Amino acid sequence: MTFVRILGVPNHIRVDGTGPVCVLSAGLGMAWFDWDPVVPLLAPHRTVVRFDRPGLGLSGHARAWPTLTGEAERIARVLDAAGAGAGVPATLVGHSLAGFHCEAFARLFPERTAGLVLVDSSVEEAPRPRRAPEFADACTRACGTLLSTAGVPRALGPFLRRTAVRAGRHTGGDPAPYDLVRRAYSTSRFLHAVLAENGRYRDQAVELASLRGRVPLDTLPVTVLAAYEGGSRHWLDRQRVLAERLGGVLRVSAPAGHLVMLDRPQDVVDAILGT
């Protein structure tokens, strides 16, 4: 376990395994331990770097609103702290919202990127800026303060986490140890962080759309791993379009819910090793 200060905030980092460097970045409101099923399968082949964004997992309280560029730069600082500096290209693996962050890193730091794997990544084809963003941010901050003062994180945080994980899986519950869940999800810092990430989601989608228009990916190897539980193929179609837009390859993990790393960790490993 390592902590590195990034813009004054202690960021929690974990490094396992040996070989070429691979960064695993979790989705909205998730923690480093959500990659636990993947790590033992991947670590014999890769140096696996995991981290928690501010307010999440074991990282310190966020001091600023999240931005796309800021998260890409955070990944760069995490790699520096893990011993993978500018001369050591890494494969970036982003789940859900973190797909935005990892794609942004690949565009802003091409010399540091060996490949890009998007695991059931968020997709916004035509994002629009928020209306009255200052007012929306103020409401988000006030909501977090009110709920924290009322003791909601401690009373309901772990329960809501467990519920969300069950909903995000094809089958099964939350495999994370309860003591880790309680430690990460019973705090006001977590509540403020997840509300901020959700509130700034559209802003980051708009930032990425702008970045795509200005900075190409060139010939970077890209894999889009999409979850499929059966039924409608609308989500698969959106993931396929994303893969085509990035010049990448689409792989399908089935049956799997949105939390592919929990339902089918071997599929995630195969996508990484094949990129």
Indicate where each model-derived feature is located:
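Conserved HGGG/HGGXW glycine-rich cap/lid loop of the alpha/beta-hydrolase fold
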Residues: 9-58, 108
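Core-facing hydrophobic residues within beta-strands of well-ordered domains
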Residues: 87, 112-113, 256
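The conserved beta1-alpha1 loop
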Residues: 23-27, 95, 120
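Active-site loop/oxyanion-hole signature of alpha/beta-hydrolase fold enzymes
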Residues: 50-97, 101, 107-109, 126
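Flexible "cap/lid" loop of the alpha/beta hydrolase fold
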Residues: 107, 117-153
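Conserved serine/cysteine hydrolase catalytic core
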Residues: 156, 177-254
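N-terminal cap/lid segment of alpha/beta-hydrolase-fold proteins
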Residues: 1-10
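Catalytic active-site module of serine/aspartate enzymes centered on a nucleophile-bearing elbow/loop
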Residues: 244-275
